[in-house]
Amino acid sequence: MRGPLSTLHGDQHVPITCHIRYVIDPFQRDAFEAYAKAWLTIIPACGGDLVGYWLPHEGTNDVAHALISFPSLAAYETYRARLRTDPAGAANFALAQQQRFILREERTFLTPVTAS
């Protein structure tokens, strides 16, 4: 992958976490939940360390979150390549496109703060 991620660190062994912020249709919360549950097995099968998905509970009713960690940028790139060819992943992406319960998706890549 090229672009902003490739310039974060010269060290390819820095752990990264992908934070995904979803703006969802609040009237299709159950459909988004089914979509999120499918990722619980797809993401680990493709090499991501899924921290979890979070649905709105109190307050804002149209924002959901996901966190996926990787030991390095190279591991993230390997994960993306696997995900592109995964039939279950393709089916889940197609479901989201057909049902249109995701209105917007934002990705932020984070690195941990360490003592050293």
What kind of feature is each model-predicted range?
Residues R2-H13:
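Short, Lys/Arg-enriched N-terminal segments with co-localized hydrophobic residues
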Residues I16-Y22, H65:
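Active-site-flanking beta-strand signature of metal-NTP-handling nucleotidyl enzymes
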Residues A31-V51, S69-E106:
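An amphipathic, aromatic/His-enriched active-site/gating alpha helix that lines ligand/cofactor pockets
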Residues G59-D62:
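Short acidic/glycine-enriched loop/turn segments that link adjacent beta-strands
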Residues E106-S116:
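Short, low-order "capping/linker" segments at domain edges
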